[in-house]
């Protein structure tokens, strides 16, 4: 018996509001992250990821307040990312109730930051978020590059080598998003997910491209992911977390069924 695989709904939050709309039935306010997080908690999600995409620094206090509110309502692990640039940011988020903190651009600018964070707070709460885009031609060996700034800025870093380096530096988990697949509903980039999962000794969360429940199964069975992250298929009520878990279980994936 391996470890049960995890389903992780993701909330993108801007200035304290969930964006990429949420259309739950009978949610009074589709933009309130606390209400939405609580809904996912009650629906049997294994974890929740909260990505703060707020550009401005002034809003950080809003974020901490929101994290505190979510943590008081939610009894599953909560990962928070976005704008994490200093050890102080991590401390503040953990104190507010986050269980794990995701580091993205700051890791690229200063890889030592990940090492310092893991030494200070423990690898178990440091997630490195990787946004990767395929840069190889179809005929060549697959190669993916790390992009920052929401996928706009190429770094020249090879995604597989970078994932290895980050786990060497102490990352306890990799949150892997395919920029090519994000928002397409065509499924995860399975080759990318598999390449990273095979390269690192820590759990990999697959993200980007989920359009149906079979995609979740493929991420685990073909991609080797330990967890699957999705936003729109859950937000828009196309599928419930419970339906997703039952579908994955029936496909032979070990799940925690509540």
From Swiss-Prot:
Its main location: cytoplasm. SUPFAM superfamilies: Ribulose-phoshate binding barrel. It catalyses: 5-[(5-phospho-1-deoxy-D-ribulos-1-ylimino)methylamino]-1-(5-phospho-beta-D-ribosyl)imidazole-4-carboxamide + L-glutamine = D-erythro-1-(imidazol-4-yl)glycerol 3-phosphate + 5-amino-1-(5-phospho-beta-D-ribosyl)imidazole-4-carboxamide + L-glutamate + H(+). It is found in: Cytoplasm. One of its GO terms (cellular component) is cytoplasm. The keyword Cytoplasm applies. Gene3D superfamilies: Aldolase class I (3.20.20.70). Its EC number is 4.3.2.10. GO terms for biological process: L-histidine biosynthetic process. GO terms for molecular function: imidazoleglycerol-phosphate synthase activity; lyase activity. Pathway: Amino-acid biosynthesis; L-histidine biosynthesis; L-histidine from 5-phospho-alpha-D-ribose 1-diphosphate: step 5/9. It holds the Pfam family His_biosynth. Belongs to the HisA/HisF family. IGPS catalyzes the conversion of PRFAR and glutamine to IGP, AICAR and glutamate. The HisF subunit catalyzes the cyclization activity that produces IGP and AICAR from PRFAR using the ammonia provided by the HisH subunit. Heterodimer of HisH and HisF. This is Imidazole glycerol phosphate synthase subunit HisF.
